[in-house]
Amino acid sequence: MKALAKLERGPGLTLTRVKKPEVGHNDVLIKIRRTAICGTDIHIWKWDDWAQKTIPVPMHVGHEYVGEIVEMGQEVRGFSIGDRVSGEGHITCGFCRNCRAGRRHLCRNTVGVGVNREGAFAEYLAIPAFNAFKIPPEISDDLAAIFDPFGNATHTALSFNLVGEDVLITGAGPIGVMAVAIAKHVGARNVVITDINDYRLELARKMGATRAVNVSRESLRDVMADLHMTEGFDVGLEMSGVPSAFTSLLESMNHGGKVALLGIPPAQTAIDWNQVIFKGLEIKGIYGREMFETWYKMVAMLQSGLDLSPIITHRFAVDDYEKGFAAMLSGESGKVILDWADA
């Protein structure tokens, strides 16, 4: 089958042919329709320090997808041939304390599709049936293909009650921009997002941001004053991994505020802990999606009117994958879709 793989220890990916995956007795085989390029895939493309330490070579990658079940293992129940599915990219052990307590998103033995094992940038993907998730007919293939990052945004944004609250989001990547739409959809009052990328800040405006602030030109304090915010933000969502953004977020929080961290900062990042302690802030780390509560919330929000369509900005046939990665690398894109229909 055709697949997009890391064949050598260096930058780039190669469209090549690999063996079709075998289907275990608890697995489903998915014929891929669409995939999306993730920030993780950009790290793999660049072959940065993280990728060099993490990604086996050779291996085909990718973990954002939608497709159709074409084969099932003999033990699989609850699915049928022809079901349209996406899937949870974190494969968990099922035996650790957190898994057995129903907290699979905290499994210490997690294996990542397209990171630690063969991925979805291929004509076919085999995953445990437990990880597959049926997509309702009213949700498009394009939106279903981005359920993985949409889930990151959902898990982060809905970690705290947002109704009537003022929310600060630092980092206008696709996940941060989707978090804007989620926060507004569930009833936040002011949703302010910061970045230095004007293209993505404009996407955030299209998704409903109260203010989208380029912090290289505009003061967040001035924006807060314009919005008559005299006490600070109630909820902060750190999506960038940039130390200066995290510092600004902590300085802008109200006493008793709640902060969710999805962005990954450098390991030795220093912060002013006085901002955390004396403000009584609550800080929560976010990794992946809650299985499968996050997935049900994603479907419910889309079915109740959440519009994520502006975040999908580019579409390419998989044979033009280099154009897709170029769009992502340019910084002037939202989500980029690769179509496998004619693969």
From Swiss-Prot:
Q: What is this protein called?
A: L-threonine 3-dehydrogenase
User: Which Gene3D superfamilies does this UniProt record tie to the protein?
Assistant: Medium-chain alcohol dehydrogenases, catalytic domain, NAD(P)-binding Rossmann-like Domain
Q: Which residues does the UniProt site feature Important for catalytic activity for the proton relay mechanism but does not participate directly in the coordination of zinc atom point to?
A: D148
- A single GO cellular-component term on record: cytoplasm
What would be the name of the gene that encodes this protein? tdh
Which residues carry out catalysis? T40 (charge relay system), H43 (charge relay system)
Checking HAMAP family in the record gives:
Thr_dehydrog (MF_00627)
Alphabetical list of Pfam families matching this protein: ADH_N, ADH_zinc_N
What does the record say about how the cofactor binds?
A: Binds 2 Zn(2+) ions per subunit.
Q: Does the keyword Metal-binding apply?
A: yes
Organism, scientific name: Burkholderia mallei (strain ATCC 23344)
Q: Which top-level enzyme class is recorded in the Swiss-Prot or TrEMBL entry?
A: oxidoreductase
